[in-house]
């Protein structure tokens, strides 16, 4: 009661947070009028001045990196809003500025669909980018990364910042003006999209100069990967940022490093999708392993002879499948072996387990699709295909065998990290989503991120109708088709969310039978995605979409006038880039009339109707689908139409609902609409969410062990990679190896009790070093020093033998190669350890504790083996006479080339010097000296 009263008086924690931020927004608004009076050039100069001020004050710079509230934020955010108005004709609402400040502080901004999240990221990204640290804006797919960077690009370019984009397949871009001359002229002539003098919320869209936008259009220009990362702000997907990090830590030269600015600040769009939904799937870079594909094919044939429940059991809740005792006996008979679980048959057991999963838990057009003889993973949260991604540990091969396509080699992990640990690399992490509050605890516990719910710009008036549940899928689909037909006849736009490609195609056929025109948006059609979504709010539009989460495009009632204007120009045969101001104006006016008229008709019909055809495991994904209706205060409706055969109901409590329907004598074809059923469904979702949270938490606990090791290994790699001379590190390695061997092999303190033979054997086998029969040392520390001198003498001999420069190169190449090979083996061993560690629980031991102990022991061995192997390889390096001669020849050629270039430069200088006769003798002398030096070298080369 007291808490309730206090909340009423003081407001919630979220209310208090918003109240504090509003004071900063008022200060930003106070600058709008004065900035509006400035010319474009003055705004550009103000941005440059702010950049220099930030970089000249280390205290302010550090405060910005950490997300502290500083006075410079007011000017930065005001400049971004002004640039947005002038180049794009968009003015950030106060709630968008609030969202931007929340992101700047390193928190999660929960903003409803249609509140303009893409634009919200611009101000915090710009302000933090002034510090010249790596600012990454993370999206869920390549299309959105490139689209968002190009769309927001005019703001950044206008204010003097570079923007990069990274896509998959190693495609990278820099965003620049589509027509640099036109853009510079527009800045010079003070051309604005948003008219001068129009300040504040009162917006007269008829005064927006649409044609002026064309002056500020941007385009993506292909560049090398590192160039995209050198930009002040880089857009890309979570997968590509993560993979580039792993690839950087497999690089064998500094030139191969692409994430040149490191990890300063990340703004993650759809943060719940990336950090929660995808957290169970680690990022893996893999190479070929030794598993024989014949075993995969044999396992695939074998599992098709088995009977479910009798020979194997499937646990859909935990997504596992395993052989029963009868199944094991069948396997031993089928493969003619005595003991299936003998160590010799480990690959066969592995292949059978994966084949069971492939046939019983992974469904075509739900979890994967077959395209051009290849298995493509379908992201269950977005419905998109993920080309280039493969399931690890033999699962992908098992599905290839199941579908009868070519089986590609199984991959061995070369580098891996979990998204949780990758994003923890950033000094400041923030994110946006329409639905984060339900996962606030997980964000706080795992990422130390607070969630702030941002108020909507206009009140939400969407109606969420109760669920309708049918006995069978057939009844459900018939009813959905009927609801669509009725609402389509009224001219109402309808969006239907399905969970699989198969479902979207089932509904599509039903609508075709009824003669209803519609668009299908799924993993097979995402190239047309933007166009389909842009039209989804038009009168009578019917859109079927697999999982709307993360689509990233607003559905405007009546349609998007800008998209329609482009269509109109296209229909008239006019290239939009070459269209005149008058042509653009006419097309836009025509499009605006059409969309405005349709919007009024759609609003009368009740706004957008959203139909969910199946409940998702996560309530968030359901809420994201609902959120497509009712944007920016528009009317709208949402409803889930389900069946007892849907996965969630079938696995979690469908029997109870079925009994209830039978008890209530619900006739066939009639739905049940009951609060008891809705609560039962929500309870099932909560249980799955909790189960998935525990799974992600457990994954993180295990990956944290590997993460500590990974950090050490990657730090060593970078230290080696970024130094030209690692001789001092090599000396330290030698000292460490000597210390370990002396203290391991000589257990007694007194020299007379030392048994030196094992020590002598080790050094002989290690680097072919013969230790003396006796040492003068009085203790083990002195003995270490004596042995170190002997090893360094041998080391000096090797350096003299192959040359100092070659020795330095060999040290780097060998150490990098060895640590990579050992780390690869470590990951393989850790994978196997993790697979079997659960067995320790049968001995009343905590598997995680046991895993930590074993992993630590393995890592200690790795570090010692690394040092031993590195020194051994360097000391045993053999450079042939031919290689040495080739090196000398290369050096000779290099020097001749350098001299030729020097002579060319001297000739250029001589030409310039003709105008300055008094300097001519000096250049002549230089040229003569260079020619003389070249002749001597050539003579030396001939005699050699």
From Swiss-Prot:
Superkingdom classification of source: Bacteria
Main localisation: membrane
Statement: the UniProt record of this protein carries the keyword Nucleus: no
PROSITE patterns associated with the record: SECA (PS01312), SECA_MOTOR_DEAD (PS51196)
Protein name in the entry: Protein translocase subunit SecA
Cellular localisation: Cell inner membrane; Cytoplasm
List of residues binding ATP: 96, 114-118, 554
Topology term for the membrane: Peripheral membrane protein
Entry keyword set: ATP-binding, Cell inner membrane, Cell membrane, Cytoplasm, Membrane, Nucleotide-binding, Protein transport, Translocase, Translocation, Transport
UniProt-listed Enzyme Commission number(s): 7.4.2.8
GO terms of molecular function: ATP binding; protein-exporting ATPase activity
InterPro entries registered for this protein in UniProt: Helicase_ATP-bd (IPR014001), Helicase_C-like (IPR001650), P-loop_NTPase (IPR027417), SecA (IPR000185), SecA_CS (IPR020937), SecA_DEAD (IPR011115), SecA_motor_DEAD (IPR014018), SecA_preprotein_X-link_dom (IPR011130)
Reactions catalysed, as given in the entry: ATP + H2O + cellular proteinSide 1 = ADP + phosphate + cellular proteinSide 2
Recorded name of the encoding gene: secA
